[in-house]
Each structure stands twice: as structure tokens, then as C-alpha cells.
């Protein structure tokens, strides 16, 4: 029914318009409910999250949002103070396919990129072989400053805009361990749904990650509605292509200059460094923190310094839909319980991970 709204003062006509509009909305709603299109928008908040546990993370999050958005309540938090920080790998995006995406990109650069592999140094090859060794046995490599430095070095002289396209081209290939999915599509659907739900409730979202900032921005693009300035990752030195060996204090950027990587690491954004970058780039203590490992505990502790703060950690306990690790998940859950972090079980709290059409490859 088409309703033309005239700006009359007449109360009776206005009331008639409202009733007709309401009837149209009911009809549209019924038609929408009868639509079998699998891409329809779910109206239920966090519909991809399980309801099996009344005390589970879904109920905790929904109740929390209700409390902090109630302007008449004691726990109301103004919109400008609603900040949530998310780790990336293992929190929003898969880290076991079979290892971190930026690590796989690094191995490709060293082992397979015909424009670079012959230039790779012994240090870079050693770091790539270490990453490959752990990936082959289904483990994540230990945190290693030497590896982080090597990962910065391989992009020396690459333009900033080039690494974006370089990453995009790599992640546009089929997933290594899953059917019906590309490398860049391995986002956890329940977490994407959570981010959108928080945004609808006026949360400002930041990604605080150990992945290189520029690589992460390329991966996130097209999947999440998050500004590039809100993606805070591992930091490397950026220079002008005409700067050569001059310090930034001794060089003035020119209109025809372009930005490129110097190939030097500034800081790997893990542990206390996450707190540093949150303080430096955001300037406020977040309300919510989401992570999946001990390297996220520092920003979790920071969030818990907020009077209304909460910290959540994801457990890698799904060994059917994901490449989980039950022993690791159990140990981490015990640690989370001791520190009052709320745990999210990939196995129990998510109805799906990547979508029903995505399956693990037999040999993965």
C-alpha cells in the first residue's frame, strides 16, 4: 500500500497514515518471513550464537548491552565511551589454515615469489622454515622477535599501496584447509555478527593485532565496516621513495613522493605493546576486549580497569568444524577462569563458524 504523507496538521489523517503504515510493515514482515532466501537479514540479535546455556556468553553480552544503553539505568555508558577492541587472528579470523595468514604470505614471499625468492637472505629463509615446520605439525610458532624482523625485511622498498594489492591477490586463492572458501574469507561469522551488533549499539570498534597493519587492512577490506584508522597492527618504518638513508627529521616529503617500506620493524603488537598502542592510538580505556590467547591478556586487563569493562576470550575447542586443540583450549580456559575472563567456546557457543557449506579438507 502506497502511503503519501502530507504535512497536514490534521490529527485524524496523521493517525490514519500511521495505522496504514503499520499494516504495510506487518505485511512486509510476513512476506519477509516467507522468503526462503538464505541471505536474508536475521532480526534476532546474535542469531548465530547458541542459546543452550542461560549463563553463556550470548546472554551475558545481550544483558550487558541492555544495561549500558539504558539511559535511565545506573550502568548507562555514553555512546562516545563505548569502545571495543578485538584481536584479529583466532578472534575474528582463522589462524590455523594451517597458520597465521601473514605468516603464510611471508612464506610465499620467500619460497615462491619469483620476483623476490632469489633475494631472500639466510635470516629470512630460516624464519620461513621455522614457520613451515610448525605449520606442518599443526602448531603455531612461538613468539620470536627475529622472525618479526625478518617479516618486515621482505617488504623493503615495496610501495605501501602495492602491499595492499599483493595481499589481496594472495588471499583471493582457495583456502589451504577448507572447501568452498578462499584464504581471505576465513572470518568467524558469529564474530562478524557480534561486531555488527555492537556497532548498531553505537560501539566504536578497533582491531588491535599482531598482524602487520597494512596486511590486516587489506584482509579486512570488504568484510567488515571498520575504518583503516581503526586497524592497529604491528608497526614498521615507512619512508619516502626519495628519502634514501636520511632520517625523517632531515627530509621533507614532496608532492611527487610515494610511500614505501624501509624493511625495519618498529614494534610487534602483542602483550604489553597492545596496551601501548591502545593508549597511543585510541586514548581511552576500552569497555570490551575480545581475544583468544595469552598475548591478548594485557588488553583484557586494561579493559577490566574500566568500571564497566568486560573481557572475553575464545577457546579453540572445535575439532570438527575447525582445527582446534582440546588440550590447549582446556589449559587456556583454566587460566581465563582464574582471571575472570568470560570464555567463548567455538564448539558450544557458535551454531556455525564459516557457514554450513564450508567443510574441512580431509588431509587438513
Q: Across the structure, where does each feature detected by a protein language model lie?
A:
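Ser/Thr/Gly/Pro-rich low-complexity, disordered linker/stalk segments of secreted
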Residues: 27-35
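Low-complexity, intrinsically disordered or signal/transmembrane-proximal segments
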Residues: 13-16
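C-terminal cap/substrate-recognition subdomain and adjoining C-terminal extension
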Residues: 40-48, 161-364
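Sec-dependent signal peptide recognition
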Residues: 4-11
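N-terminal Sec signal peptide cleavage junction
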Residues: 22-24
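Alpha-helical substrate-recognition element adjacent to the catalytic core
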Residues: 37-247
Amino acid at each position: 500500500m502506497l502511503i503519501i504523507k502530507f504535512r497536514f496538521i490534521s490529527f485524524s489523517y496523521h493517525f490514519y497514515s500511521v495505522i496504514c503504515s503499520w499494516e504495510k510493515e506487518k505485511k512486509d514482515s510476513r512476506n519477509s518471513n516467507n522468503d526462503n532466501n538464505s541471505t536474508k537479514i536475521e532480526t534476532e540479535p546474535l542469531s548465530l550464537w547458541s542459546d543452550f546455556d542461560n549463563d553463556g556468553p550470548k546472554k551475558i553480552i545481550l544483558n550487558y548491552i541492555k544495561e549500558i544503553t539504558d539511559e535511565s539505568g545506573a550502568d548507562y555508558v555514553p555512546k562516545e565511551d563505548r569502545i571495543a577492541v578485538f584481536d584479529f587472528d583466532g578472534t575474528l579470523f582463522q589462524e590455523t589454515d594451517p597458520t597465521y595468514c601473514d605468516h603464510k604470505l611471508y612464506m610465499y614471499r620467500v619460497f615462491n615469489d619469483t620476483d623476490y625468492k632469489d633475494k631472500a637472505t639466510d635470516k629470512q629463509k630460516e624464519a620461513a622454515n621455522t614457520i613451515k615446520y610448525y605449520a606442518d605439525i599443526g602448531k603455531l610458532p612461538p613468539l620470536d622477535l627475529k622472525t618479526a624482523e625478518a617479516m618486515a625485511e621482505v617488504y623493503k622498498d615495496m610501495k605501501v599501496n602495492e602491499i595492499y594489492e599483493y595481499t589481496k591477490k594472495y588471499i583471493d586463492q582457495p583456502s589451504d584447509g577448507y572447501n568452498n572458501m578462499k584464504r581471505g574469507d576465513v572470518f568467524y561469522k558469529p564474530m562478524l555478527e557480534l561486531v555488527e551488533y555492537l556497532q548498531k549499539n553505537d560501539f566504536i570498534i578497533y582491531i588491535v593485532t599482531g598482524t602487520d597493519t597494512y596486511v590486516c587492512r587489506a584482509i579486512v577490506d570488504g568484510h567488515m565496516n571498520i575504518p583503516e584508522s581503526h586497524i592497529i597492527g604491528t608497526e614498521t618504518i615507512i619512508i619516502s621513495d626519495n628519502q634514501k638513508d636520511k632520517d625523517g627529521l632531515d627530509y621533507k616529503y614532496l608532492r611527487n613522493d610515494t610511500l614505501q617500506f624501509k624493511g625495519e620493524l618498529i614494534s610487534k603488537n602483542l602483550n604489553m605493546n597492545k596496551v601501548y598502542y591502545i593508549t597511543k592510538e585510541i586514548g581511552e580505556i576500552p569497555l570490551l576486549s575480545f581475544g583468544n590467547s595469552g598475548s591478548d591478556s594485557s588488553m583484557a586487563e586494561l579493559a577490566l580497569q574500566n568500571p564497566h569493562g568486560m573481557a572475553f576470550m575464545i577457546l579453540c575447542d572445535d575439532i570438527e568444524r575447525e582445527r582446534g586443540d582440546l588440550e590447549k583450549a582446556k589449559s587456556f580456559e583454566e587460566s581465563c577462569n582464574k582471571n575472570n575472563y568470560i570464555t567463548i567456546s567455538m564448539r558450544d557457543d557458535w551454531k556455525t563458524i564459516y557457514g554450513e557449506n564450508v567443510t574441512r579438507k580431509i588431509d587438513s
